[in-house]
Structure formats: C-alpha cells, structure tokens
Amino acid sequence: MEINGAHKSNGGGVDAMLCGGDIKTKNMVINAEDPLNWGAAAEQMKGSHLDEVKRMVAEFRKPVVNLGGETLTIGQVAAISTIGNSVKVELSETARAGVNASSDWVMESMNKGTDSYGVTTGFGATSHRRTKNGVALQKELIRFLNAGIFGSTKETSHTLPHSATRAAMLVRINTLLQGFSGIRFEILEAITSFLNNNITPSLPLRGTITASGDLVPLSYIAGLLTGRPNSKATGPNGEALTAEEAFKLAGISSGFFDLQPKEGLALVNGTAVGSGMASMVLFETNVLSVLAEILSAVFAEVMSGKPEFTDHLTHRLKHHPGQIEAAAIMEHILDGSSYMKLAQKLHEMDPLQKPKQDRYALRTSPQWLGPQIEVIRYATKSIEREINSVNDNPLIDVSRNKAIHGGNFQGTPIGVSMDNTRLAIAAIGKLMFAQFSELVNDFYNNGLPSNLTASRNPSLDYGFKGAEIAMASYCSELQYLANPVTSHVQSAEQHNQDVNSLGLISSRKTSEAVDILKLMSTTFLVAICQAVDLRHLEENLRQTVKNTVSQVAKKVLTTGVNGELHPSRFCEKDLLKVVDREQVYTYADDPCSATYPLIQKLRQVIVDHALINGESEKNAVTSIFHKIGAFEEELKAVLPKEVEAARAAYDNGTSAIPNRIKECRSYPLYRFVREELGTELLTGEKVTSPGEEFDKVFTAICEGKIIDPMMECLNEWNGAPIPIC
C-alpha cells in the first residue's frame, strides 16, 4: 500500500520510524504532510480537464496494459472492455511474491488453528458457524452465490454485457495483485489468459448490491475457474463455450482450480463489476462532455451569436475552474471564426431593433457545463482510486501476522460517483435539447428555416421535426434516469448488509444515460451540420438576390424613357439594404411572391423615395411611382431563374461563395460528419431519412471515431483563456 507514491509490498516489513518527513510502518508509507490523502486527491485535479481526457485517450490506445495493482487507469479499463480490441494484459512479475505470501499465510494460519472470517467461519450473518474444511467452504460459497438469472428468451437478455465483464475481470485482477487477499498468483494469470484470448464468462446482469462487493456476478467468474457445470463463457467469435472449452482456448493447461481457503472469498468479495462498468461509463462521459463544449461553440457560430459570452473576465470573476475551462475552449473555437465576423456585421445593422444578448442556452453554456465537468472529473478520480484499491474482507496483513476484518467491499464511492455523474449527464443533455430547440425554431434561430428544412418547397419538407420530437423523448428519459439510485437501499442478508452501495445498479443506470446522451449528441451534431450548410446556401442565395436586384435597378430605375437620368436611380442603395436585412428563407421558395416580405419591402423603398420626390411625381416622365410596375415585372422575369441557378450550383458543389466553416476551428468536426461518414444535407426532395444519417454518426461515436476530429478542433488551444488586452 502507498500514499506518497512509494509502494511497499505486503511481504516486507520495517519498524515504524520517521524518514524524510514520512511515517514508515511495517507495511505502508504515509506522507506525514498528507496523512489523510486529501492532498494527493487534490493534486490529481491539477491541470486542465481537456489534458486529462487526452491522457485517457492515449492510455486507451496503448497496445499493452501493465498491471501492478496501483496504476490502473480509466482509459486502460475502457480499452480492455472494448470487444475485439487487440490490447493485451501483462501482470507485473514483482507482484508475484506479495500475492503468494498472503496465500501462504492463509494456509499456514488455518493449519495453526487461527479463526478467520470466510476461512473457518460461515459468511455474513451466519459467520457464527465454524468449519475446518476450508476447501469445501469455498466451493459452497461459489455454489450459493450462483443465484443469478439469465433467462432463455431471445427478446430479453439478463446477461451482463461482455464489455462490462471484461472490465470487471481486469479490475479484479488489479486489486488482487496488491497481495492482501490470500489468493494464488496462478489464478490471476488464468483470468488474464481469458482476457488475452477474448474469452468472457457469462455474468448475470442483476443481483448485486455492491456490498459485500459484487458477490453474485463475481461468483460466475469463480464458477468458470472452478469448472462448475452451470458456468458458461463466450469465445472470441461469439460462440458459446463450456468451462472445459474456455480453458482449452485460453491455453490454461493446469485444469480447473480447486480453491484453497479464502480464495473464493477473494474472487467474489470486491467492487470490480460496479467500478469496472463505472470506468467504461466515465471514459465515454469525459469525451462527450468535451464534445458538448465544442458543440456549444459551433451552436453560437450557426446561430450568429455574440461571442462576448466567453470573455475571460466574466468567468474569472466566478472562480469555478470547470466554467473557466469551458468558456476558454468555446472562446478558442470562436476566436477568428468566419461566422463570428459575419455575425458582428449582422449585429451592427439596426442594433437598437435586436436583442442585446443571446438566450441562456447559448450565453450561459459555460456556466451550465462547468459544474457538470467538475462533477464528472471528480467522479473519474474517485473511480480511479477505487479500481486501484483493495476491496475485499478480511485483508491479509502478512507483516503484522493478522487478518483484518473491515468493510472495503462497500462500494459507496461507485454509487455516489455514478449518481452524481448521471445528474451531470442529464444536465448536459438538457442544455443540448435547449440549444437544439432554438436551432430548429425560426422564431429564435436568426434566419434559418423552420425545422432546418432545405427543400425548394417548404410545404413538402418538415426537416428535423421528427428529430425534435425524438430529442424531447431522449431528454425526458435522461432526466428520469437522473434520479438517485443510492437512496433506494434495502437491508439485505438477514440485516447484516443493512446498508449497501448499489454501485453496479447506479453504474448500469449511468451507462443507460450515456447511451441516451450519445443519441442526443448525434442528433444535435447532424442538425448543426445541416445549419452550417443552410448558412452556406443562405449566403449564396443572398448574394444572388443582391446581384439581381442591383442589375434590375440599374436597368429599370437609372434612366427614363428618353435615356435621361431618373430620380429613381437613388433607390438602388436602399433596395440592397433590404436584401441585406431580410432573412433569405422567408422568401427563398418564391422570391417574387407579393405575400412574402422581400417584394413588399422592395416596393416600400420605391414608394418612400416617391413620397419624397415631391412635385416631380406629378410628371409621368420623372415619377418614381410609375417605375414600380416595371421594376417588379423585370424582377419577376429574372430573379426566380437566378435563385434556382444558385440552388443548382449549390447542389452541384459549385457555389460562388465557399462554405465559411472551412475557415473555422470547428471545421474538423463538420468534415468528419460530412466527408468521412458520408452524410449529406437532408431535404424532403431526397429519399434519405434523418434517422439513416443519425445512425452513421451514432455508430461512429460509439466506436470512438469522433475523438480525433473533436481533438483536432482544439489542437491549437494552449490550455488558457485568451489574454485580456
């Protein structure tokens, strides 16, 4: 065990003494300046969350996981849990002596007649019973704990996902390697062989309260090791295996294990199933939280938002590190953004007629996401401590020649961390839903079409309407899942386990929440890309309309019937202002319709000029009113064709104005969705449904392919806000 970083194996021993500020006892080293470990816990929180996520990803991608008992990481657990991954596990040979020393101690103490829980006694509330048949006791332990239900129907599965089982196996090996559990090293090698050969025991999905550890599910790993006839496993190609077939495929030639005293208890009395699944959940949650930060910034881009919401002073005055980092990341994405430059020009037009600030879903996104990131980060560190902890009972202290009866099997850090993480996930999902709802609503989205429809005929295209309904469903379920699990504890096992952590149940519910957040992230990301493309189309259509209006104005309004300069020539500048101010998608499907605002406002410009033309209006030659009919007729003859030509050029990828997203730091994410995954602009004119495109992105997120383009968006970020000048 260690606190200051210098490991002392259980087999050694030195007298208690002070040395270099540390307190050394027979089996541990305690930092005298941090005896309660608060300082070490705080030290782990230094640096940015993004850097921590990058480290997780780097660990996830390493080809080998070296286990020694105290350095296992969330990223490594996630890597091993991934089905089909080629990552291998290697055990530290230096741990062998300590592991075997504790195993030998158990045998020696039993032979001496020492009374130890689970070695010579019954279990739990029946620990008053005694036996000298330690081997038979371990066999009975595994038998009665095999109480899970798998079911035989095809439509429902009551089997723990294989990924979670692999995570549990890895964590259990790691915790047993520290040499306080009384189990042979050979058993840990056998579990490692199962992992390295992609052989996964079948564990029940339910049936554990994660105190005393995950007894029921872990007993099925022990059942496979001992060759119980009811034990099952799945091979590398998904084939069902018996215990005998599993041993053969794993290359374990020693045969089934006859568990020695304490070994069955060592295998089952730990929190590995709950903490293993929690590790998987937190790896994905950390990635999705960074994605939410980036999407909030891109949301600001496509909404033509005001970037001052990321100003460093605002967040420095609030002091919360999660908020400061979230704002700094968004600030980095928006810094130099071509969309923000365009938005600034837009906001400078008629500023007194527009809202002074954006709505909360945009403007307070750093304040909203920051606390969630802090919660997720603390939960990550808590679970990382848990997977490197010794979690069974009793603990074998060879150096003091005693078995210590305690309660490290209580998985409260898992239950609490997972409940908190689930709340954070629900909050991220709620923000995403609020942002999505603004994006698809033409009353809020600064000129984008309702439902992000992209067809020429909006009456036959309802865009993301179905997706918005689905998002409401996702968000509702996510908020329901945010309810705590740990407040539903029941007294168990004859009131011996009268408080219990429900760690795995909470981990399972959090895993469900992560899946739903992935659905929401997928839908929102595709909608963001749709909005990017609609902004691109909007810019090309607006320029086309401006050019056409300018040409028609020059042709019709510049001169009179005799070629003389006409007073109406001064209308052109104001006509172009109308085009700049009018939202393109309010008229794009029929630009010359008298019921649409473009023609109405262009006509009003000419009328206003006529009203100030004074006496000249009485003369038909100089009258501006007389020009209105000719102007509109010429516009109707030309504009629809030009707008259709601009749309056709856009569809063919030959637009005159390139897509602004290519000039933005958020471009790698857009490129990934559009080019690498092959999604396209959704319209009612095409057969492709939104769900088909969502599936492509969802699969990519589940496979971790979103990580690289996401990180590429932040490659240039230096880990700090932009300096205040």
From Swiss-Prot:
EC identifiers of the protein: 4.3.1.24
Originating organism: Arabidopsis thaliana
Binding site for (E)-cinnamate: 269, 357, 363, 393, 465, 493, 496
GO terms, biological process: cinnamic acid biosynthetic process; defense response; drought recovery; L-phenylalanine catabolic process; lignin catabolic process; pollen development; response to oxidative stress; response to UV-B
GO molecular function terms noted in the UniProt entry: phenylalanine ammonia-lyase activity
Cross-link (5-imidazolinone (Ala-Gly)): 211-213
The name this protein goes by in its record: Phenylalanine ammonia-lyase 1
Oligomeric form and interacting partners: Homotetramer.
Gene3D superfamilies xref list: Fumarase/aspartase (Central domain), Fumarase/aspartase (N-terminal domain), Phenylalanine ammonia-lyase 1, domain 3
